[in-house]
A protein has these predicted regions:
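Non-catalytic accessory regions flanking glycosidase/transglycosidase catalytic cores in CAZymes
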Residues: 239, 254-395, 402, 406-451, ...
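A hydrophobic/aromatic-rich effector-binding and dimerization subdomain
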Residues: 1-5, 57-122, 135-146
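Basic/polar phosphate-binding segments, predominantly the helix-turn-helix DNA-binding elements
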Residues: 166-168, 173-210, 229-251
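Short acidic-glycine-tyrosine-enriched beta hairpin
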Residues: 40-55
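Generic protein-terminus/edge-of-domain signal
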Residues: 1-44, 239
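Short, basic, alpha-helical segments at the C-terminal edge of helix-turn-helix-like DNA-binding modules
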Residues: 154, 207-220, 254-269
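Short, Lys/Arg-enriched, Trp-marked, Pro/Gly-tolerant hinge/linker segments that flank
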Residues: 93-102, 120-127, 136-165, 169, ...
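Noncatalytic carbohydrate-binding groove/subsite architecture in carbohydrate-active enzymes
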Residues: 470-616, 620, 642
Length: 815
């Protein structure tokens, strides 16, 4: 990855053939052992060890078992700015024995800080300043008086570099020593001597080895040995086989068999590259990450209409909220959090997984295999839901183990079984029995308000669930469910298919599902999706270059700050194209991350993310179902302590997080939108004006790609792009003259964030009931009230910290 004449490259199981750089390359050991060889020496570097290769020095790298190293290359332009003497060489090898040496530690710190600054989108000036400082330290402390390369030696190396470039670009063509020498205007014997001296082998041997390395990779595919031979520049398959046997000790065919056997034998999971990079990042400068530059300024004049004109606001974010599983809804602390949320925010629907899971005990079988049904636990749940004024949004899943075709779960909880049914008639009997029971108990008119779905189609597409069910299986399940429900009552509503964005937008994803079930007479009554801003490596070509040979998380957070808006706009285009324009969209799950242990989600970041995304997307879908209300999620072992980075608006102890307080603020929104822009939104209800201000800062690339682990709660704010304060000036014109009561509600690290109050308490892991009560009481936004006298215009001016949100409510006083 290249930025400002600085190149970062993570090498993982990757060998570099003979090469050289015009600048200086530093190799920082991350994991295992890597060997860097020059003409003078071989250096094996392990974790936290550093070796620097001088400019115009030939080197090669060889990876040890499960090894990783970070290469940082500083360009000649950087060296020049550092006053690096021309042709100056250095001798810098920092073993682990130098961990107590101040200069060596300074080199490590500068490498780590430079790496982190790049990923935090630091401006070019600061990035280059740090790089120049590192280069200056290298030559001033590690150069020697006799370490200057002769000019003629540099010219020879440049010639060799040109020859190597020709070989590496024409290796699969007819290329020879004579042709290469002719193109470089030197003799055959001269090129031959240079190769022998600097590369340590002959021109022909180097070319054959390069061709073999490409051929080995091709043997992983299905092409014939003959095709591979000619594709890689060998004159015949016999020539290829002879060279291959000399190098690898077996024929290409035998080698391919060994590859297949190796692929069929599963390997235990290895450490993530993100774990390795902690070896580097532990040395990063811990200084404040917030910019000290002048604040960004937004100035806007907003003219209020004389009438109640304006775009109506649909409070789609209050239409639905999620808890994890049906069984979770029977837990006292979860019920208390639901009661509080209903009182302070007021949602319409409650969604959850697992109504058919074994721990709800609905599906039972007699000894002869005939089904019977037990609704004791389900009745307790649905009675409670309706008691607190919520409407059930019932996901029909997962699969009861006795009805499962495959016993499979991706979670720690054995009650969760993800599978196709083993008997269509029994599945339909289960669905019919449930619907009939609920209609008998709660009344048809009531149940018609409920919403039903089948569990997500993601499980038919995600790689780790490939054996569980196919696309065709999923469509059959949906169609069987649809027919059963509509047979009971045509006005009951069934939606699908709950796809992640990548699956929803894929040609063979949601589009295919909708067309297939429509063709069979089972079109969903509403379209459901799950919106997490994740993308594949291949969708980010810039980073793909950096990590193309790495192992990391299979999904990364999108760099698109407006991911939700763009995803829903694309989804609406698809609906139009395939004849589903009138079919409502429900975002049944929605969060800033798919990671269940993301401490940044406990911070003020989540408040700014929610305010920004709700105000951008409230009109893009009928429901925006936040995932989820509580940190209590019985998929994995529920961690101890108060804050662990769970999805919830509440901790498991019932402490409201900053995101919850943001939704409370949104509950004050007006009936109509007046105007909006990046960082601000103005609404109105009769003679009351609501102004929302927010300073959203996105994750930096280092964290988006999971190259920054977040385990220390004190580091939770170190994973965002470096940004300063935001100054917003709004001129509200067209107000009725008079005195206005001005309420100002502020949510930032000083007020409204339980996480930051917890940090102030020294982040205690064990908290008494009194401690929790104190934290709950202190986790309130700051409120200031004053009177503002206006002759028809009001000037609002404020500065926001990163992740800060504010609500200003203006209400004209009577008289």
């Amino acid at each position: 990855m290249d930025q400002g004449h600085i190149i970062f490259r993570v090498l993982h199981h990757e060998n570099i053939s003979i090469t050289m750089d015009a600048g200086v390359s530093l190799f920082f050991g991350l994991h295992g052992q890597y060997t860097i060889s020059t003409a003078q020496e071989n250096y094996t570097i392990g974790a936290s060890e550093v070796y620097a290769v001088s400019p115009f020095t030939l080197y090669r790298t060889v990876s040890g078992e499960d090894a990783g190293v970070l290469q940082i290359t500083l360009s000649p332009e950087i060296l020049q700015k550092a006053d690096w003497p021309q042709r100056q060489m250095i001798d810098c090898y920092l073993s682990r024995s130098t961990l107590t040496d101040s200069v060596a530690q300074d080199i490590r710190r500068r490498c780590a800080t430079l790496f982190r600054l790049y990923f935090q989108q630091t401006d070019q000036v600061e990035l280059q300043r740090q790089a120049v400082s590192l280069a200056s330290l290298l030559w001033s402390r590690f150069s020697t008086t006799d370490s200057v390369q002769p000019e003629d030696s540099i010219n020879t190396l440049k010639l060799l570099e040109s020859a190597l470039k020709m070989i590496h670009t024409q290796w699969n063509q007819s290329i020879s020593l004579s042709e290469t020498a002719a193109q470089l205007y030197v003799s055959d014997s001269y090129i031959s001597r240079v190769f022998k001296k600097y590369v340590g082998t002959t021109f022909t041997k180097y070319l054959v080895d390069l061709r073999l390395s490409h051929a080995v990779n091709d043997l992983k595919g299905t092409d014939s040995v003959t095709e591979i031979a000619y594709r890689n520049g060998f004159k015949s398959d016999n020539s290829f086989i002879d060279f291959f046997k000399k190098a690898y000790g077996c024929t290409p065919g035998k080698y391919r068999q060994q590859l297949k056997q190796s692929a069929d034998t599963p390997e235990p999971p290895k450490e993530d590259v993100s774990d390795w990079l902690q070896e580097l990042l532990q040395y990063a400068d811990g200084a404040s990450l917030y910019s000290k530059s002048a604040p960004t300024v937004i100035r806007k004049t907003v003219r209020l209409p004389e009438t109640q004109d304006g775009e109506p606001i649909c409070q789609s974010w209050r239409q639905m909220v999620n808890i994890g599983y049906a069984h979770d809804g029977l837990i006292g602390s979860v019920q208390e959090q639901l009661r509080r949320a209903q009182k302070e925010i007021g949602f319409t629907y409650l969604r959850f997984h697992g109504i058919f899971d074994d721990d709800m005990h609905i599906y039972q079988e007699n000894e002869d295999g005939s089904p019977w049904f037990n609704f004791a636990y389900a009745d307790l749940l649905f009675d409670f839901i309706q008691e607190i004024g919520l409407i059930p949004y019932v996901e029909l899943g997962y699969m009861p183990s006795k009805l499962a075709k495959t016993q499979y779960t991706v979670f720690d909880n054995p009650a969760i079984c993800i599978s196709m049914y083993n008997d269509s008639e029994k599945w339909q009997a289960l669905v019919q029995a449930c619907l009939s029971h609920w209609i008998d108990k709660y009344g048809l008119a009531n149940v018609r308000k409920w919403r039903f779905t089948v569990f997500s189609m993601n499980y038919s597409r995600l790689q780790y669930t490939a054996p569980v069910m196919s696309h065709e299986d999923y469509c059959k399940m949906f169609e069987a469910t649809y027919q059963t429900i509509k047979m009971i009552d045509p006005e009951l509503k069934l939606g699908g298919a709950g796809c992640f964005p990548g699956i929803a937008l894929a040609p063979d994803g949601l589009r295919r599902f909708l067309l297939d079930v429509k063709e069979h007479g089972c079109p969903p009554d509403f379209i459901t999706v799950q919106c997490y801003p994740h993308e594949d490596f291949s969708q980010d070509s810039d980073f793909f270059y950096f990590t193309s040979k790495q192992t990391s998380m299979p999904s990364v957070l999108s760099k698109d700050k407006n991911f939700t808006l763009h995803f829903l706009q694309w989804l609406n285009r698809i609906r139009q194209e395939i004849g589903f324009a009138d079919c409502p969209v429900v975002v049944e799950e929605w969060n800033s991350t798919l990671w269940q242990r993301d401490l940044s989600g406990d911070t003020c970041y989540k408040a700014a993310w929610l305010i920004k995304n709700v105000l951008q997307n409230y009109d893009q879908a009928e429901y925006l179902g936040y995932w989820l209300l509580t940190d209590f999620l019985d998929e994995w072992l529920v961690p101890g302590g108060v804050f662990h980075g769970g999805y919830g608006l509440f901790t498991i102890n019932g402490i409201p997080k900053a995101g919850y307080q943001a939704l409370r603020m949104l509950g004050r929104i007006g009936e109509r939108k007046i105007a909006s822009g990046e960082g601000w939104f103005v609404s109105r209800t009769e003679n009351t004006i609501q102004v929302y201000l927010y300073h959203y800062c996105h994750y930096d690339a280092l964290y988006r790609y999971r190259y920054q682990k977040l385990t220390d709660p004190h580091d939770a704010y170190k994973v965002f792009e470096v940004d300063g304060r935001l100054k917003i000036e709004l001129e509200l014109c067209g107000l009725d003259p008079g005195v206005y009561r001005q309420e100002s509600w502020t949510l930032n690290r000083s007020a409204g964030s339980a996480f930051d109050k917890w940090l102030e308490m020294e982040a205690p892991r064990v908290m008494t009931p009194e401690d929790l009560n104190y934290l709950n009481d202190m986790a309130q936004p700051l409120c200031k009230i004053r009177d503002a006298d206006t002759a028809g215009a009001l000037h609002l001016q404020t500065e926001l910290e990163p992740h800060e949100v504010r609500l200003i409510v203006l209400k004209k006083r009577d008289g």
